[in-house]
Amino acid sequence: MSKGMSEIISKGIIKAQNKVQNKAQNKEQNKEQNQEQFMLDKDEYRYRPWLFFLCAYFFTWIFWIPAIFVSEDKGAILMLLGLLAPAVVSTVFVLVSGCEELKRDLKEKIIGFYKVKWMNVVWAVIIYALIIVFSILFSLLFGQSLKQFSFTEDFSFTGVGIGSAFVTITLASIIEEVGWKGYCEDSIGQYMDWFIESLIFGILWSFWHFPLLFIKGTYQAGLMISPLYVINFFVGAILMGYIITWVYLVSDRSILACMIFHLFVNFMQEKIAMTAETKCVETIVIFIVTAIIVLLNKKMFFGTEHVGRLLKTRFGEGN
């Protein structure tokens, strides 16, 4: 082999080695840049979901449990204080967080009318109205009556001394959503996809109502005539957690949208003359609707782009 040929081969080998080295260096640099960008995109605030639930349960039940043993009038203030607890805990968690971004986020979620996708709220209301319609129709198979397509004269509970029953369900819809959407759901969603988040939240939110079963005058106390009705309430609440999470996300995490939907659900549950048996059928219908919503929004429920950077993520139609 000539000297010239050896030099050409040698230069070719060196060039190939340099190319491999440069490629490896560029790959390492890109990896470092991606890691740096990920750190920049991550939320600075660390959510504490389990501490929130401990506080929310404690400051609710510390008032509701004593309300079991007193008269309705005397228990009124205890009921109201317990109802306020999650919203107060949520607000305190945000205010003492030291995170201006979290404080601004809560403000926007509550009063940000511009965040509400009004047509999505309308569709959510229509969907729930259809759930009621189909539940009553299916209940005919179990001997129920078409007379359920009517409004009741009164609410099924007394309002527990907090004013009228309508005022009670209105307050519950507003106050609960400030607590659960103000901090709670985000604190879970920060660490996992929304499908698992909805399941965890639904279970914990459902069980939060437990003492109400034993407080005279409440809707839940009226269910104690049958274990089936009690179980149905808790299962239905878990499933509704998925639907209201959907309403929350398609309106870019608007609490106002959830308040409107929650109020409509509470009102329909009370004023439509469905029997307790039909409400058990309703839970089956809600399960079917929940499955459809999840399947049609797989990216929203199973995506993890928001994990670790929820405050920097925009939600809506495309999520």
Regions of interest found by a model, annotated:
Residues 222-287:
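Functionally important transmembrane alpha-helices
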Residues 169-174, 206, 233-238:
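Residue-level hotspots within the lipid-embedded alpha helices of multi-pass solute transporters
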Residues 134, 171, 184, 240-244:
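Hydrophobic/aromatic residues in alpha-helical transmembrane segments
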Residues 175-207, 249-254:
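Membrane-interface helix/loop boundary segments of multi-pass membrane proteins
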Residues 195-225:
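Membrane-helix boundary elements
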Residues 2-20, 27-44:
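Short, Lys/Arg-rich, polar N-terminal cytosolic tail immediately upstream
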Residues 35-173, 201, 214, 270-319:
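Specific transmembrane helices
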Residues 49-53, 120-121, 183, 197-198, ...:
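Alpha-helical transmembrane segments and their helix-entry boundary regions
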